[in-house]
């Protein structure tokens, strides 16, 4: 496995590769990330994992400075998994001058996560587009855990005619249903025991819909009330069309239930995809 930190060296290393798969990450890797690595290895001759904590997607009051950075352990795990290249650019590598150009995003980027974290998706898409230009992969792997992000990146690729196929990896969960996330490291033992309640409530909505319930606002409100009663502060719970991310209607068959909520000072997000027959 090679660890590369500069763009020129990476391009030289990749120039003769028949096919390249990219797995963009912010590090602090867990089984969810590693499942994406396995998918990448099935789709290309060379697997590149990038590690970059993207300052652009953090608001000033958010956790950029304390976001877990575990580069040594990350590289050990990736070597065990047979990754070919780990690309770890510094901030000056990706942003040698102030970033003046950014994408104009569609309205969906201002809803849900975008409404709670203004500028988040602009920061995400800027760095993802940079990575696509640098690595020039044929395939890139993103997790369904960040469902709205996945859909926005798919739109970016389609509408900008980028020559890369986006493949989604399923959310990996702990035994109690909690979606694996780097921010789970913030949870203490008591919080960890409660953390799966968000996933359980999203799943409960999905089960109600699968059983024939179509009063989506009532299902959303009931889940929010249950979480609030258990000490959570909910940003949103919303039933959406799974591709457009517009509010779902009773006629839709492809759905996703998305949620974000605070457990004390820790913000968790999750989703529950649902396809009705």
Swiss-Prot record:
Listed EC numbers: 6.3.2.1
Entry's Gene Ontology cellular component terms: cytosol
Primary location recorded for the protein, binned into one broad class: cytoplasm
Keywords noted in UniProt: ATP-binding, Cytoplasm, Ligase, Nucleotide-binding, Pantothenate biosynthesis
Name of this protein: Pantothenate synthetase
Binding site for ATP: 26-33, 143-146, 172, 180-183
Active-site positions on this chain: 33
Record's catalysed reaction(s): (R)-pantoate + beta-alanine + ATP = (R)-pantothenate + AMP + diphosphate + H(+)
One of the protein's GO biological processes: pantothenate biosynthetic process
UniProt-annotated binding residues for (R)-pantoate: 57, 149
Coiled-coil region: none
Assembly and interaction partners: Homodimer.
Gene Ontology molecular function, alphabetical: ATP binding; pantoate-beta-alanine ligase activity
Domain of life: Bacteria
Keyword Secreted carried by entry: no
Pathway named in the protein's UniProt entry: Cofactor biosynthesis; (R)-pantothenate biosynthesis; (R)-pantothenate from (R)-pantoate and beta-alanine: step 1/1
The family this protein is said to belong to: Belongs to the pantothenate synthetase family.
InterPro entries from the UniProt entry: Pantoate_ligase, Pantoate_ligase_C, Rossmann-like_a/b/a_fold
Alphabetized Gene3D superfamilies for the sequence: HUPs, Pantoate-beta-alanine ligase, C-terminal domain
Note: The reaction proceeds by a bi uni uni bi ping pong mechanism.
Job description of the protein: Catalyzes the condensation of pantoate with beta-alanine in an ATP-dependent reaction via a pantoyl-adenylate intermediate.
Ligand binding (beta-alanine): 57
Localisation: Cytoplasm
